[in-house]
Amino acid sequence: MEDVEIKPRGYQLRLVDHLTKSNGIVYLPTGSGKTFVAILVLKRFSQDFDKPIESGGKRALFMCNTVELARQQAMAVRRCTNFKVGFYVGEQGVDDWTRGMWSDEIKKNQVLVGTAQVFLDMVTQTYVALSSLSVVIIDECHHGTGHHPFREFMRLFTIANQTKLPRVVGLTGVLIKGNEITNVATKLKELEITYRGNIITVSDTKEMENVMLYATKPTEVMVSFPHQEQVLTVTRLISAEIEKFYVSLDLMNIGVQPIRRSKSLQCLRDPSKKSFVKQLFNDFLYQMKEYGIYAASIAIISLIVEFDIKRRQAETLSVKLMHRTALTLCEKIRHLLVQKLQDMTYDDDDDNVNTEEVIMNFSTPKVQRFLMSLKVSFADKDPKDICCLVFVERRYTCKCIYGLLLNYIQSTPELRNVLTPQFMVGRNNISPDFESVLERKWQKSAIQQFRDGNANLMICSSVLEEGIDVQACNHVFILDPVKTFNMYVQSKGRARTTEAKFVLFTADKEREKTIQQIYQYRKAHNDIAEYLKDRVLEKTEPELYEIKGHFQDDIDPFTNENGAVLLPNNALAILHRYCQTIPTDAFGFVIPWFHVLQEDERDRIFGVSAKGKHVISINMPVNCMLRDTIYSDPMDNVKTAKISAAFKACKVLYSLGELNERFVPKTLKERVASIADVHFEHWNKYGDSVTATVNKADKSKDRTYKTECPLEFYDALPRVGEICYAYEIFLEPQFESCEYTEHMYLNLQTPRNYAILLRNKLPRLAEMPLFSNQGKLHVRVANAPLEVIIQNSEQLELLHQFHGMVFRDILKIWHPFFVLDRRSKENSYLVVPLILGAGEQKCFDWELMTNFRRLPQSHGSNVQQREQQPAPRPEDFEGKIVTQWYANYDKPMLVTKVHRELTPLSYMEKNQQDKTYYEFTMSKYGNRIGDVVHKDKFMIEVRDLTEQLTFYVHNRGKFNAKSKAKMKVILIPELCFNFNFPGDLWLKLIFLPSILNRMYFLLHAEALRKRFNTYLNLHLLPFNGTDYMPRPLEIDYSLKRNVDPLGNVIPTEDIEEPKSLLEPMPTKSIEASVANLEITEFENPWQKYMEPVDLSRNLLSTYPVELDYYYHFSVGNVCEMNEMDFEDKEYWAKNQFHMPTGNIYGNRTPAKTNANVPALMPSKPTVRGKVKPLLILQKTVSKEHITPAEQGEFLAAITASSAADVFDMERLEILGDSFLKLSATLYLASKYSDWNEGTLTEVKSKLVSNRNLLFCLIDADIPKTLNTIQFTPRYTWLPPGISLPHNVLALWRENPEFAKIIGPHNLRDLALGDEESLVKGNCSDINYNRFVEGCRANGQSFYAGADFSSEVNFCVGLVTIPNKVIADTLEALLGVIVKNYGLQHAFKMLEYFKICRADIDKPLTQLLNLELGGKKMRANVNTTEIDGFLINHYYLEKNLGYTFKDRRYLLQALTHPSYPTNRITGSYQELEFIGDAILDFLISAYIFENNTKMNPGALTDLRSALVNNTTLACICVRHRLHFFILAENAKLSEIISKFVNFQESQGHRVTNYVRILLEEADVQPTPLDLDDELDMTELPHANKCISQEAEKGVPPKGEFNMSTNVDVPKALGDVLEALIAAVYLDCRDLQRTWEVIFNLFEPELQEFTRKVPINHIRQLVEHKHAKPVFSSPIVEGETVMVSCQFTCMEKTIKVYGFGSNKDQAKLSAAKHALQQLSKCDA
């Protein structure tokens, strides 16, 4: 906003001068510019505003009493200064801000404006010290008495360092609170002592008059009216009806209503629904008595609207009923009133009752006088000259008088176009619920209209007095009696123009009293003036001893060693805030239970000294760490006793570590930080800490690792005179021989093979599968090597040259920058050809090596040359490799047959039968060939050799007979270039790169196998020791991998056509139950035209439809009412209710089968022992079931899916993942048994987080052995014994910064000569310097800033691996161990990876012997006490299929947090934490063992379909376990029964209808507080979304509305998980636990395995019309929000999903969207 220049008036400057020197309370009457004084003071004290606090910077506080005032003052400061202003009120959720957020705010802003409590907390929690403030301005400071935060704030001054205190400036227009108009002087003295300064105003009378000119002095008028005597019969009748209703209301039972907390937690909202109803009726009676029947007929409509909305919002049926009864009564009353009004008119038309005559006749004298005054004052005036305020006492009166005036003005011609009324009420609702958001919006527009002059008569409830700035008014009417001095001063202060009138209405009888009162008020005003006149600016400041005495209190504040202060009066709020951090579902409200002790109890505990005093006890909620009862000290009154108890409880919580050093409940982050050194200290060396918030950019930054070659391949280059080992490589075809495959079949099986020659011995390696175009082959590396000694350096040189020739000339895997590496470093071994020598022994084929130091270059020849050469001989061509030089390519071909019977002049076969071979060749290539010399010689038949070099996956190319025949080519030998290289060796070479690469990773896998076996002490087992024979590598057939003809992988997506997800509507019963499940609708943000009518302002014309609309709007149900009428049953029956389900669980008709089975019967008796044991569990129990962990399994575990092999880590990772969660759960539950479930879950999620696993695996030094890159030999593979020039390679070691700018183009420019590449291994100096220059030039060219690493890394042994892959590897390795060695051994591996640290006396192998300890289980309880809670528990045990030995576990598993009576065990949360992990692990193990054909993605879907909350809830209900839950919450039981009815209609099956019901997690679980996790760029967007959420009626805070949208209560699934944990803890036998689970889940295990339910995101994406778009996630503290925009009925709709991580939030958004679509598709 542009700066508004306001000129200071003389007296303002003098006040500021005084304030510069000392504290003061500025007293200036309303309208004389206090705010401006404050702004001048801020400017005087701003010298250190722009320094940071650390270097002596200062800040200013501006404290206000209410949110509206604070908002107004913040705007004023921003308008008139250039300071950075921050605005803070409780509603923004500042209570939950972290220290980091506060320090950012304090760093950023210089003047902090806000409400008092916020600043009080800010200083007590040491976010800012008093010494860092230069000035504190306190607006409306006369409130600072008693325990008001203003006074509490000033109390802090007494315990702070006295030399560094800020200046205190109070501002007020009245010096006295309310009506305390006696002994003004003492009151004022106290005020001065509180604020440590004098009241100051302007010094002499002349100035005082001056202020009075500026300030307000209206003419005061008093209008009296006769007291009304007669009471109409109708009034009596109505009063009697209401009395009667009260009696029946008291008898109604509406169940236990959950207690709702306000934002500040100071007071309870909604404590009694009944008293709310009574209050409305009492209000109505008051209106009728005070303003007459006509007014009453308007007031009753307000009630009807209110009750109708409440009825629709009612959470339980009984509450609905209560509001319905009230509604009926209102209708009746309205009828009586309207009838009475119609007595005066002659017809029954409603409209005729709104005449001036009727209004005057049926109003009380007071209203009559008021209307007369209006008429007299304003008749036929110019509306622009009128600015009138009418003050009334009650909120409802505003609406009522507003309605009355509208009709009166309409029916009075003189006023019709003159007055335009509006009304405004104070805000009483603390909850920022939907209605108050609308309300505030409407209020704002009301004030705006008044300011703009569109409305010129404003009716306000007296709350408007303080500070809400409505411009100068010339008429103020006070309709109701003035109650307090301040009200008088301030409402009078509203009349600000010089000829203003201030009109009071009073009854004749009260006239004297009122005059008396007004006189007293004026006298008080004068007293104040006297007090000030006597001591204007010469007064002495209050002495220190006066201040000390003034703040003396019953309880001393507690200061801890960090200097933070715990004020007794803050203790209650802290306690409540602490309870809010205790985890609970939407229905368990956790609050401390206060109890006033009876005398006998009190005397027993405190003895005689406590006689006549009050003692209060506090019990914390069931799941809090503090289990003991806390007693207050005996106090004089209940209030201080309560404070004392809360104060003591806070001190205990502080000592237990539940409050942090600032006395604020510990956040999850702080709790994690407190154990970071125990579990996460290894993060530090990677520059990370577990509490650090992750910046998105850093989080995704993947690390680069130095690859490590297997030990056996390092420094293994053969040397002269030393023993070397040659390991022969055998290829065995696994396909049938036929015309097409024959050449391959025969050539692979010749005795000539290759071997790898090296100085180290190799372990036994598993046989590996490869896939050629002809089919599958097996590759075996010989177990026993050939031992050889190289005699001389000539032989060694020959071996080197042949090795280089193989890769350079035949395989062509050679970049111009490669050199032969003779240093014997990584992968230093040679490839040698073997031949069958004398005595059938294999030996080196020296002859071949001698002949082929280099492969001859193919070249053509002209006719003369061919005439001079000898004629070709058949024996030279048999089995050799040739190439057609005259065709345009240099393709090697294998000669498969020599046709002696054919000549070039023979006729061709097949389609060219009319030509000879000679004619055909000449016609195509004649001009290149010239002619054929030897026309009478033989012909050769050749086959193309594949160019592919990767053979890991099956090539799914389709070969039909025609293309196979085409493979057969007949050529003229004289026109071919013959390499003379043996065809079988050439053919075997093609497979070599794939084999060598696979051996490389197999050796790594073998090393891991040995390493783990040794650690676990299993290397001595016979099958793991020296006799270990690896099993052949297994192909995971579920990974349907496809390749194109070149061997590149084609990703497989079995993409089906998008299909509509509808199926026929099953039965009437579903349709009925669906109608009850109101799945709420959100359309966001609402457009203006969708906003409901402002009911209060259109009371008289509101129709039921609008009420219905308002209700649907307020709960977010805006649906097109006309298009979709829920009640229209036929409409539903004719349609299908859209959601996909197949023929689930056989075709039983739902809901019929079990109609006559009693509720508590088991669904089916379970027989022990018929469940197939899980292999993993057998291995856990005994060693004889252990199987060796195979080399191939370790290989799979280090192979990422990105490597595109026929096996990878994903399947093992599913098992490892669930094992990891299980072990982390058991470990934390036993190590920190007294933590609450929220903290356990948080630490667990950090323990199993990808970041933690990443650091653990790096610590174990495994990442460098992973296979994560698809094998492409020609582009990203360094063959053995080959490297970059050594001097170039050194750059990476010696100058890593420079190495970053080396690009692949620079390497290609290296153009090495043969001398450099094959002999020296270094590049020449000229070349080298040119190369370095070229790299430097990259900085200037368009390569500047490019990242070459991905293209260059393979040459220098570096690899970049995604962090997630590394975490998955760790899980997969654990999976290998669990699968083969069982749980105990796998627990030991956790210590190996340092994921868990064992305690001295608790080795990790004993994790399964978990003791549930902690303070939560009371020992020595007898069974009768337990069974007192467990009614009919044998039915439960029968249905569960398990009988408990110790029923304490059972009791704990059934106790909901809302059940305060059970103090024996605590609630089920701890068990649920354990049960969740046990269930997840056992189900994962089962599907892992039983679904080998299912791909990993489907396995994951299957697992989540089985263990998600909805499925658990269905199973819980199907087994009738919900009857036994111990909870005290009407809302919860109603939602459960709603869900049970729905499930019965579904035949208790988990259908897809059920799967999209909303769970609690889908409805926003925690308040969205702005935590530092938020990416700053997304902040405005997130805020917008959050505020839209708020407007939409999803309150952004607390539990206000959350539970209304839940269809599936989390409690059902939680109880089932808790019962599973209870079974395990009771029997300590996982196999027995599995039997129980299997019997519960059997129908789903079979059904879902048959047809895996696809997850909601895919379901949405595959929907025909939806076209969903998901937003990127917005992180908010512990919550993530994802929005999803999709199309439904041609409209774009946006929904929001919440969850604890990105995937959950996305799933939840998809669910919301599917629910919408399910309606639209109908």
UniProtKB/Swiss-Prot annotation:
Under CDD domains, the record lists: DEXHc_dicer, Dicer_PBD, RIBOc, SF2_C_dicer
List, separated by semicolons, the cofactors it needs. Mg(2+); ATP
Q: Please indicate the residue ranges that the annotation assigns to the motif DEAH box.
A: 139-142
Annotated region described as RNase III insertion domain a, given as residue ranges: 1268-1362
Recite the UniProt keywords alphabetically: ATP-binding, Cytoplasm, Helicase, Hydrolase, Nuclease, Nucleotide-binding, Nucleus, RNA-binding, RNA-mediated gene silencing
Q: Where is the PAZ domain?
A: 875-929
Q: DRBM domain: which residues?
A: 1697-1719
Q: What is its EC number?
A: 3.1.26.3
Annotated phenotype, changing residue 943 to E: Decreased siRNA length fidelity. Abundance of 21-nucleotide siRNAs produced by the enzyme is decreased whereas the abundance of both 20- and 22-nucleotide siRNAs is increased. However, has no effect on RNA cleavage rates
Query: Per the record, what is the consequence of mutating residue 759 to A?
Result: Decreased siRNA length fidelity. Abundance of 21-nucleotide siRNAs produced by the enzyme is decreased whereas the abundance of both 20- and 22-nucleotide siRNAs is increased. Partially rescues RNA silencing activity in mutants
Result after altering residue 956 to A: Decreased siRNA length fidelity. Abundance of 21-nucleotide siRNAs produced by the enzyme is decreased whereas the abundance of both 20- and 22-nucleotide siRNAs is increased. However, has no effect on RNA cleavage rates
Q: What class of enzyme is it?
A: hydrolase
The reported effect of residue 1217 to A is: Unable to unwind blunt termini (BLT) dsRNAs and fails to rescue loss of RNA silencing activity in mutants. No effect on binding to BLT or 3' overhanging (3'ovr) termini dsRNAs
Ranges where the Helicase C-terminal domain occurs: 366-536
Q: Where is the Helicase ATP-binding domain?
A: 15-193
Q: Which Gene Ontology BP annotations are present? A: apoptotic DNA fragmentation; cellular response to virus; defense response to virus; detection of virus; dosage compensation by hyperactivation of X chromosome; global gene silencing by mRNA cleavage; heterochromatin formation; lncRNA catabolic process
- Which Gene3D superfamilies does the UniProt entry name for this protein? 3.30.160.20, Dicer dimerisation domain, P-loop containing nucleotide triphosphate hydrolases, paz domain, Ribonuclease III domain
Q: Which residues form the RNase III domain?
A: 1177-1382, 1433-1628
Q: Would you identify the family this protein belongs to, as annotated?
A: Belongs to the helicase family. Dicer subfamily.
The identity of this protein, by name, is: Endoribonuclease Dcr-2
What is the organism of origin for this protein?
Drosophila melanogaster (Fruit fly)
Gene that encodes the chain: Dcr-2
